[in-house]
């Protein structure tokens, strides 16, 4: 029986409160290989120059909930077996992965390839893209979590590439948090330990991916979704990341250190180990293309 696969383009920017995420998503979808999978656009409220309203501790809460529901309606209408998501900020992952967990009887495996856990609310840093994995586990933000009909099992989740901040990064993050009054409601480590989620950093995975293979086997993962936040990559090697902003450093979390060949090998290995039914790629920030696009937008002869 043929499996039905759909691609979603969700250029959501409100979760990271950065309009550049929209262009990053569109370019990502354009770069992906062509095939016969339909590409469906999830409607997003475009940036109009008005700052997002902070509603109950989240910037753009209203828009984000509306966009989540729009994605859910599209997915439910198509009833796919597999979903590819091009984002956008990390919060775009909630609708497809929640659906896939329902589709596969609450037994979906999820590997979260990300420099950050996306489990924890940061008071004072009120952007929704810090919480998608928490929401999928039935925690995170209560209003978003209630849209997850069957929360993922913590034992079916593995966080790969989780960054450990360097001493210099720790100092910069601490200074930024103190200056802006930012504090986590609960530390990443506390949440990971409380829920019993397995993790591995990039260095460990460079030596061996045995921990992931064992997790797939021990947890009986038959269907797997892959979340890929491109910020797991080393910004010195791959420049299209929030952390590689040529004009302003990003000092709110540690940068990733994974190299692209390692990332590709990991995804290929996962595809051999089990049935990959979901892939979401997020947080693409192509600074050179963004700046060139802005330049072209200001040249008179191109705008007559």
Task: Indicate residue ranges for each PLM-predicted region.
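Catalytic cores of soluble, metal-dependent hydrolases
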Residues: 2-84, 92-105, 177-304
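Active-site histidine-anchored catalytic micro-motif
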Residues: 82-156, 160, 274
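Histidine- and/or cysteine-centered catalytic micro-motif in compact active-site loops
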Residues: 115-116, 162-163, 231, 284
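Short, well-ordered secondary-structure micro-motifs
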Residues: 122-123, 170-171, 236-239
């Amino acid at each position: 029986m043929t499996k039905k696969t759909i691609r979603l383009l969700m250029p959501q920017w409100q979760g990271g409160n950065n309009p550049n995420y929209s262009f990053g998503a569109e370019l990502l979808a354009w770069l992906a290989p062509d095939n016969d999978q339909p590409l469906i656009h999830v409607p997003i409220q475009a940036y109009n120059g008005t700052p997002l309203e902070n509603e109950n501790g989240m910037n753009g809460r209203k828009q984000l909930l509306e966009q989540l529901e729009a994605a859910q309606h599209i997915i439910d209408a198509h009833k796919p077996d597999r979903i590819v998501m091009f984002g956008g900020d990390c919060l775009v992952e909630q609708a497809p992965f929640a659906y896939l967990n329902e589709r596969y009887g609450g037994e979906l495996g999820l590997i979260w390839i990300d420099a950050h856990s996306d489990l924890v609310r940061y008071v004072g840093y009120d952007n929704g893209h810090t919480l998608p994995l928490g929401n999928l586990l039935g925690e995170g933000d209560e209003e978003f979590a209630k849209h997850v009909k069957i929360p993922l099992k913590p034992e079916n989740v593995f966080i790969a590439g989780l960054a450990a901040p360097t001493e210099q990064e720790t100092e910069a993050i601490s200074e930024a948090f103190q200056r802006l009054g930012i504090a986590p409601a609960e530390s990443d480590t506390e949440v990971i330990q409380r829920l019993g989620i397995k993790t591995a950093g990039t260095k460990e995975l460079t030596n061996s991916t045995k921990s992931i293979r064992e997790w797939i086997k021990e947890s009986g993962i038959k269907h797997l979704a892959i979340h890929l936040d491109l910020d797991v990559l080393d910004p010195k090697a791959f420049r299209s990341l929030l952390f590689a902003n040529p004009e302003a450093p990003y000092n709110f979390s540690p940068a990733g250190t994974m190299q692209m060949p390692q990332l590709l090998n990991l995804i290929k290995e996962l595809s051999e180990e089990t049935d990959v039914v979901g892939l979401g790629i997020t947080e693409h920030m192509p600074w050179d293309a963004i700046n060139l696009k802005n330049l072209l937008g200001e040249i008179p002869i191109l705008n007559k």
